[in-house]
Amino acid sequence: MGTYCFGIDVGGTTVKCGLFRTDGTLVEKWEIPTRKENNGDQILPDVAAAVNAKIEEKGISKDDVEGVGIGVPGPVNSKGEVDRAVNLYWGYKNVAGEMEELTGLHAKAGNDANVAALGEAWKGAAAGSSDVIMVTLVSAVELLLMARS
């Protein structure tokens, strides 16, 4: 198992990036602009460049990186594919597959509200709770209910 992982939140204005230890400890966070021109074609290459630059800056071997988790606005299937993300101007996009190609790292993608709720349940305000309701309000309202019964 790698020592590090990246968490990425793709928003309509900025992409929030985090380098973490696999125990959930935040090492560093930063943002890059979300470039939506040309149907958002540069968003994932920009994210990959930011991840690769941080690996180089910190002197981390890619063998020490478990992977990249990326949250995007819109429905994401179990393969990490998006059929449409309206506020990013995306039609179909294999988010996980493209990130793997661009970074050489294992990647998983999910809906931004879902992965935010998972993070809160693991290390955030909902840690230790058996049931969680998360509401996000950014460019859209999203609601997630997690019941661990």
Question: Model-derived features: where do they sit?
Answer:
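Short, glycine/acidic-enriched loop or turn micro-motifs at the edges of active sites
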Residues: G12, V115, S139
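Short glycine-rich, Thr/Ser-proximal phosphate-binding strand/loop in the N-terminal lobe
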Residues: G2-A49, E56, E81-D83
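Structural signal for hydrophobic packing residues in well-ordered secondary-structure cores
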Residues: V51, I55-K58, T103
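Glycine-rich phosphate-binding loop and adjoining helix at the ATP-binding site
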Residues: D41-A48, D64-V68, G74-I133
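Alpha-helix termini
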Residues: I55-K62, A125
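Short beta-strand segments
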Residues: D9, G67-P73, M134-L144
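Glycine/GP-enriched mid-protein hinge/lid loop-to-helix segment characteristic of carbohydrate kinases
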Residues: G2, G18-G24, E28-W30, N39-Q42, ...
